[in-house]
Amino acid sequence: MNELIKHKLELLPDSPGCYLHKDKEGTIIYVGKAKNLKKRVRSYFRGSHDTKTELLVSEIVDFEYIVTESDTEALLLEINLIQKNMPKYNIKLKDDKSYPFLKITNESFPRLVITRYIKKNDGLYFGPYPDSYTANEVKKLLDRIFPFKKCKNPINKVCFYYHLGQCCAHTICHTDKAYWDRLIDDVKHFLNGKDDKIIEDLRSKMLAASKEMAFERAAEYRDLISGIATMRTKQRVMSKDLQDRDIFGYYVDKGWMCVQVFFVRQGKLIQRDVNLFPYYTDAEEDFLTYMGQFYQDKQHFIPKEVFIPEAIDEELVAAIVPTKIIKPKRGEKKQLVALATKNARVSLQQKFDLLEKDIKKTSGAIENLGQLLRIDKPVRIEAFDNSNIQGTSPVAAMVVFVDGKPSKKDYRKFKIKTVVGPDDYASMREVLFRRYSRVKKEGLQAPNLIIVDGGVGQVNVAKDVIEKQLGLTIPVAGLQKNDKHQTHDLLFGNPLEVVPLPRRSEEFFLLHRIQDEVHRFAVTFHRQVRRKNSFSSTLDHISGLGPKRKQLLLRHFKTITAIASATSEEIQALGIPKTVVEAIQQQITDNKNDRSSP
């Protein structure tokens, strides 16, 4: 805890409000609300926490707070601040999570369409449906039963669907408002589960067609009846009152929360929404924050009723969700909340089971790799790769895997300092010596296994540095790629030989991940360095353009091409004088002409 935080903690009020934790860049990384700001904010910096909260606290270098009149006001403010700042440690709802609806347009000649966007007073909406496939299947069925207009053709033209009996040509069929009102009422009854009359009508038409020996038409009516029956069976009846409602349940364990929402429409469960996320403060408060964000998303239909668990404050929910909030006390409705809660518990347990299974698989892979190489279990693996283009901007990178997982805080980047031209062996020698001479000198944690990207030559160079130059006893292995640039062989031993490794084994998958990761990290770093070098060389020797202004241009425009495309005004907007801007543009033009001249 730094001195600034210590001083601010002493000044915190005993009031409700919101607090905003910031990192060293001044970026808001977490927004929370509290009934008592002093108690809540101080709790982050006192006592012990679980791992994820410790990670959050380790990044906090400053905080701000906003005092509110009430807990309700604090909740509303918190939701708005999260939506505005999108802090990385706050609950994040699934991106672009919207559900399809069926819509009857309010045009003079209505159409039946599928949409994910609800607009007020823009038609009748039915749904939501769990996915596009389900919505399309229902629409196809409705299209075959109800002859809505299918296209935007002028009303004096007959479309293709008219000939299929699925569209009412408006110059031929009824055009009076009463006809369309009856048709819309039929669709509403059908989608509300009152389809007995429609089935009876279809059955009568099927029998009549059979008597007339029109068996193809009779088969069509039979298929329609079958389609309605199938749609019925796919929707589980959850209540007899045919009410539209959302049912919330949540469960917390091991610092994680799972929220389940059942979407019940006309008494039938049509879909559920599942979200799992870590929580850092109070479970009930994080649940309220989730609900606020959930319904702030305009694509989430707000039903007539929302059921919430017993532990949640009804008044706070009512302040953020504009509908009837119910906390069921007994009977079927309470059982529905219990069912949502049970499903939340099951989903959370599944997550933990999968994590445990993954840990066991990874642990087994590390154990097996150690046995295969006849070394101690390689709990910590450090892997290296070089990257350059014909010797220009040469760099290297090191990635670290601990217990089979990337430890990104331990990753390191190296600019090659002593090697001229494209020499992978010399570059590898320099980087390994720099890394492990420091490990030896400073007593840093040494790996159980070093992996270099390359064949026999790279491995021999690495062993020479580690064993002969530095006198260390760290096992060294090499990973060779095939002609498709894919992980192929593991080299190890004295003398070096290919270690037999089944391609479908967990050990092979682990090594493949390590090689891909170190390659990605090295190439990304090389691109950054090359871009910066290209940027700097082009902008060298321009009067008035020092290192700070170069860095400003690099951060804003990224490339010389982007600067060349920018207007003088755009560059001046960064605080660079007009005369310097003109010099920059002239330099870029001169360089371009030099490259194009023979």
Curated annotation (Swiss-Prot):
Coarse class of the protein's main subcellular location: cytoplasm
InterPro entries documented for this protein: GIY-YIG_endonuc, GIY-YIG_endonuc_sf, GIY-YIG_UvrC_Cho, RuvA_2-like, UVR_dom, UVR_dom_sf, UvrABC_protein_C, UvrC
GO function terms (MF aspect): DNA binding; excinuclease ABC activity
Ranges of residues in domain UVR: 196-231
GO cellular component: cytoplasm; excinuclease repair complex
Annotated PROSITE patterns: GIY_YIG, UVR, UVRC
Sequence ranges assigned to domain GIY-YIG in this UniProt record: 14-91
Cytoplasm recorded as keyword: yes
Alphabetical keyword list: Cytoplasm, DNA damage, DNA excision, DNA repair, Excision nuclease, SOS response
Places the protein is found: Cytoplasm
UniProt-listed GO biological process terms: nucleotide-excision repair; SOS response
Function: The UvrABC repair system catalyzes the recognition and processing of DNA lesions. UvrC both incises the 5' and 3' sides of the lesion. The N-terminal half is responsible for the 3' incision and the C-terminal half is responsible for the 5' incision.
Assembly and binders: Interacts with UvrB in an incision complex.
Family: Belongs to the UvrC family.
Name this protein carries in UniProt: UvrABC system protein C
Organism the protein comes from: Streptococcus pyogenes serotype M1
